[in-house]
């Protein structure tokens, strides 16, 4: 009863926001703008009003952290290891190059623009993997600020809209094959809804293949989350050691405890993928779990939006938006060039 009293109001508020956001998203062809983006933006718009009601705080914090992890875990039901084999070795090669481009280029641009490494990393993850889902998965393990999460999702979304419009035109111009275009869209466009829109705008075959490639690309969340978790712990220890320099008794010489920093929700995510791969779960149940995962994700993004105001975003300046634009453009170009080299266009 105490839990319900403390958390229910905030959780129910985000659930209502998720329903409204889903309704608005359904009004748009191809669901070009996902419900998560609407929830985030509406939440930020309501922040000045909602922040006055402290009764919501516990529920909003619970939703933006605990329910977010649950959404990521359940998302595993949409994937299977057989999909990796289905897309083929050439597709995996392209994905490797786009991931290296997103994170390598993101790191260099982050240094150039003197950005906080967490915001830079979130934008790179959103661009290189799968938009808001990747950003949401990485944010807990690096203790990202809500404003950074909101900015990263907004930055990747803006370029996604541009790509949905230009990709089919470019595909026709370059006379790409259905599979070649599907691979390009699946590896270079970020959010799933945007991949669907860009893929099927070219052809049904291209749309089907682009979605498979996109889902396979999502599996790279696992190693990336582990790497970011380790980097964050190393930087925390480095900061502590610098603060206590000269005091040997407080100096952190011990090795990093992997079990302590390991993001266990990612292990459960893999368990869900493994269960899906066995085929023991009926499609009706896996479809329901997938829908539930998406709804919980929208709730979580809504909670993050409700905890973020536009002023905190403005503090980051214009550099992160430029960072996101350049990284997105690089990923698009690299994906196309690698496909050309492999003869897959």
Curated annotation (Swiss-Prot):
UniProt entry tagged with the keyword Transmembrane: yes
Q: Does the keyword Membrane apply?
A: yes
Query: What is one GO cellular-component annotation here?
Result: plasma membrane
Report how it sits in the membrane.
Answer: Multi-pass membrane protein
User: Which residue ranges does UniProt annotate as crossing the membrane?
Assistant: 7-24, 28-50, 70-87, 91-113, 120-142, 152-174, 181-203, 209-231, 261-283, 316-338
Q: Which domain of life is it from?
A: Bacteria
Q: Where in the cell is it found?
A: Cell membrane
| Keywords for the protein's UniProt record, in alphabetical order | Cell membrane, Membrane, Transmembrane, Transmembrane helix
**What are the annotated disulfide bridges?**
none
Q: Name one Pfam family in it.
A: Cons_hypoth698
Q: Would you identify the family this protein belongs to, as annotated?
A: Belongs to the UPF0324 family.
- Record protein name field: UPF0324 membrane protein CTC_01844
Source organism: Clostridium tetani (strain Massachusetts / E88)
